[in-house]
Amino acid sequence: MQIPMLRLLAAIEDDDRRQVKKWLKANAALATAPVAHDTLYEREIVHWLYKGDTALHLAAAGYRLEIVRLLLAAGANANSAQNRRRSGPLHYAADGFITGPAWDEKRQVKTIACLLDAGAAIDTQDANAATALHRATRTQCAAAVEYLLHVGSDPTTRNKTGATAFHLAVQHTGRGGTGTDEAKMAQQHIIAAFISSGANPALKDGKGLSVIDRAKSACIRELLSGDG
């Protein structure tokens, strides 16, 4: 199983749909098989794949929409979360590197929509109690945040440290190209998306601090108050 699985994963990274179809036709069990080792992908898809993940996790991380559909049709589980971090394909699809050369926000949103249509639970929490909304917010994926809020993700859900995704939105998370012009613009769009969704800036985290309390930037505080 391991060699065919590695070949399938290589085809996914290369976005080679013909080869993906070939390997799934030869061995349908590959659609649900777990990977055996932790691997960092850095070439076409930038993401860790952990022991217990499936091919669908990698396809989701790379926004390989057509391959995601192929894997789902072959029986892949949209809610599979057998890695030690308990992350599902939807968590991986919500991650992003907005300053990276392969960044594609439209394909990211379509991949998220495809997984949700296949039954992925929108607010499933990983080992850190993070939802897909937390992860999209943390990595400054503005279009993904807007879409997840639009289709009903709960902005009040807290992660393991007690933070909601809205709290993360007003802080520098160290991800998503923090400090770049792209990241600053994405952060403003994300905050606007939370406000438009009806999320309350007075929302408290696990330490009793509101979203406004967590906002250190005067510009962000203006956005939250409606003056920006």
Predicted segments, located by residue:
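Ankyrin-repeat boundary/"N-cap" motif
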Residues: Q2-L8, A33-A55, A81-T99, Q125-T131, ...
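Ankyrin repeat domain, specifically the short helix-to-loop turn at the C-terminus of the second helix
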Residues: L24-L30, H37-D38, R69-N77, A113-A121, ...
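Leucine-rich solenoid repeat scaffolds
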Residues: I195, N200-G228
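Ankyrin-repeat and related helical/solenoid repeat scaffolds used for protein-protein interactions
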Residues: A143-E146, H150, T156-K207
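Amphipathic alpha-helical repeat scaffolds
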Residues: M5-E13, K21, H57
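Conserved ankyrin/ankyrin-like repeat signature
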Residues: Q19, E66-I67, R107-T111, A143-A144, ...
